[in-house]
């Protein structure tokens, strides 16, 4: 299953929940040269790793294919970028949306608000996933304010409970992530050509940070602040979307990296 979180002694897999790692846990790659590698190379958000379970513990992980980066997982911080952890989460959407927890799927009208608290029954079975019925719609987070108001997000939203509070993760295609990074990092008045340069830089940085797996213990790659790249503080603009589309897949590299 897809890796949702990995920490020093446990891993969370989609549809399997949290599994603990054996004291003699090892990680191997089997594409190219077969060799042992580090746990840091198990990337969250991807399903390229097979896990070997014995006695209710994970004793090994086998990374069976190279990673092809398509999605990025972003932690959404509180208003003012003051914390990774939220006291509550309130959502609605621009169209019908689905809240999934455990084996339960609730369908809500876009205008219906769902409130989630740490003690909420929604969280009794682990992470919550929120998806729109129509992939063109967006999910709005009402407990966060950005420069343009309550932010709306492409892709899916996950909510997980930690000791410090709730974390919000937006899983989104990298190209669509850039739609809301480019205008947040550079004023669109600079024009499309300047925005195209920004798009290439932002894409390059996103790929690098995705591979670093910095927030693996929370199930994310980056957050939405200046710690990485500011994301969705300014809403998408036509010119920023155009700049991303016209540079699709282009990255900067130095010495092959």
Which residues does each predicted region cover?
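Conserved, single-site charged/polar hotspot
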Residues: 1-257
């Amino acid at each position: 299953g897809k890796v949702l979180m990995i920490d020093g002694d446990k891993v969370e897999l989609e549809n399997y929940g949290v599994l603990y790692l054996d004291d003699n846990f090892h990680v191997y790659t089997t594409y190219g040269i077969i060799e042992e590698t580090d746990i840091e190379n198990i990337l969250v958000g991807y399903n390229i790793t097979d896990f070997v379970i014995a006695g209710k513990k994970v004793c090994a992980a086998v990374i069976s294919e190279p990673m092809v980066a398509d999605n990025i997982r972003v932690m959404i911080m509180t208003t003012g970028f003051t914390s990774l952890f939220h006291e509550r989460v309130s959502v609605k959407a621009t169209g019908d949306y689905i809240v999934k927890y455990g084996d339960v799927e609730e369908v809500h009208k876009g205008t219906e608000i769902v409130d989630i608290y740490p003690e909420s029954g929604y969280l009794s079975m682990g992470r919550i996933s929120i998806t729109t019925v129509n992939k063109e719609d967006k999910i709005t987070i009402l407990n966060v304010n950005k420069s343009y108001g309550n932010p709306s997000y492409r892709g899916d939203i996950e909510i997980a409970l930690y000791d410090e509070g709730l974390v919000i993760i937006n899983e989104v295609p990298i190209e669509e992530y850039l739609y809301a990074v480019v205008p947040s990092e550079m004023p669109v008045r600079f024009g499309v050509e300047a925005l195209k340069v920004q798009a290439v830089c932002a894409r390059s940085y996103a790929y690098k940070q995705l591979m670093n797996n910095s927030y693996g213990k929370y199930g994310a790659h980056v957050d939405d602040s200046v710690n990485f790249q500011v994301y969705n503080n300014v809403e998408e603009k036509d010119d920023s979307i155009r700049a991303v589309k016209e540079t699709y897949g282009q990255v900067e590299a130095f010495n092959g990296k």
